[in-house]
Structure formats: structure tokens, C-alpha cells
UniProtKB/Swiss-Prot annotation:
Provenance organism: Salmonella agona (strain SL483)
Cofactor note: Binds 1 Mg(2+) ion per subunit. The magnesium ion binds only when substrate is bound.
Necessary cofactors: Mg(2+); Mn(2+)
Protein name as it appears in the record: Isopentenyl-diphosphate Delta-isomerase
InterPro entries for this protein: Idi_bact, IsopentenylPP_isomerase_typ1, NUDIX_hydrolase-like_dom_sf, NUDIX_hydrolase_dom
Amino acid sequence: MTEEHVVLLDEQDKPSGTLEKYAAHTLNTPLHLAFSCWLFNEDGQLLVTRRSLSKKAWPGVWTNSVCGHPQQGETTEEAIIRRCRFELGVEITDLTPVYPHFSYRATDPNGIVENEVCPVFAARATSVLQVNSEEVMDYQWSEFKSVWKSLLATPWAFSPWMVMQASDEQARERLLDYCQR
């Protein structure tokens, strides 16, 4: 895969340039564009993934299915499809926004900051997973309500963005509706 960049955003969340992804994620990470996607299988189960230990931020924590950064000139939907293929080796369908205006700032225990405008989507996996071990060290298909209970009981075991997204009542209801269709 070619070197990835992040799209930097100004105070009005408008693109203001790009920066190499690993250079962007520091102790003073600038605001940038990202995405988060929750994948469900045909049985309505949610795919939770455990981040590889080689990840710069939040290595080894459980998180929603796939996250990433749209590249300059790429739509968020195109970026989600690209990262699903790269990280999970999976094709998706029915890509649906569930929390389009989510943004957050969080600091990893090692000091790395995430500072993202991060629209959240749900999608349906349509093929068998072929996980990229450089991105994902483990995964599990689980019932959404079971994942929600785990998030409430042990939020420290999950990425902060996953906890924040699921903690938003409207987003949680949309995810629950999505998995039940």
C-alpha cells in the first residue's frame, strides 16, 4: 500500500492540506478527517477487532470493525471500502451513515493524540474475512447488545472512539436498528 496521508481540517472542518499519517499522529496531532465503520454479518452480529500491537495509537485494544482516513480526492465511502479490503480482506454492501457528525479528541496512554472529525458508518460484510495481521491481531463476531454490555463494564479494554460512538444514544439506536434488518 502506498504511503497514507491525512486530510487536515481547519476550525470550520474544511480541508486545509495533507500530512503523512505517521507524522500527523503525535503528542500534538492536528485536526484531521477520519472515518469509523461498524460491520455486521448476515446474522446481524457485529465484528469487533483487536488492534495489532504494532499500531502507533491504542495497540492491542478492541475496537469497532474498521477505521481509517480518506485520502485527498477520495470520498469517505471509497475510503471505507478500501480499508475493509486492506485490513479485513472483506467486501461490503449497504454502507449507511449512523453518526455523520462525530468528532473527538483522545490521548493514548503513550501520549499519542487522536484529533478527528470522524463520521461513523455501518455496513454489511458480504464475503469471508481474510484479516491482515499487521492491522488486526484478533477479531470476534458478537451480538451488538453483548458488545454494548462489555463497553459499559470494561470501557478501558476498547478504543475511546468506539466507547464514545456507542455511548451516543441516537448512534447506538441506529446501529441496533441496522443489525436487526
